[in-house]
Amino acid sequence: IRGSDYPSILEDNRIDIPYADIAVDGAGGALCAIPFRQIHGRIDSLGFRIGNVAYSSDISDLPDESEDAVRDLDIWVVDALRRTPHPTHFHLEKTLKMIEKIKPRRAILTNLHIDMDYETLINELPENVYPAYDGMEFVENQAIEKQS
């Protein structure tokens, strides 16, 4: 991948037209998603919107042109790698500022580094923001369960 410091280990299946619907068919049935451009350090990455849910991992910035893709969401699953700034990922403060700007109904923080303790985060995050955990499941427009 041009500009990346990491060798590619996956088969290259390019999505050349961001913001245009793509369809994927798999074991769970057909799925329609809208890819949108994100910044991931010196390279671009793609986020995906599926209905009123968006997924943004590997993101260090969201270009203005992509903001409409994450407006009016029920759930935004979004990168929050660690507490301190990182060159290729959102850090907690930046993630929370973006959540405040984009205003999803709820947000789930993902790609959390080991120093992002679940119990600590649960006690300090805004009421509509949840740290993800292994095995977490959610359903659009239904309550998000906290890990017990």
Task: Kindly label every feature range from the protein language model.
Residues 1-56, 122-148:
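Binuclear metal-dependent hydrolase catalytic cores
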Residues 54-57, 108-110:
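Short, hydrophobic beta-strand segments that form beta-sheet elements in well-ordered domains
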Residues 63-75, 80-148:
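Binuclear metal-ion centers of metallo-dependent hydrolases, dominated by the metallo-beta-lactamase
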Residues 36-40, 57-64, 87-90:
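A general structural motif
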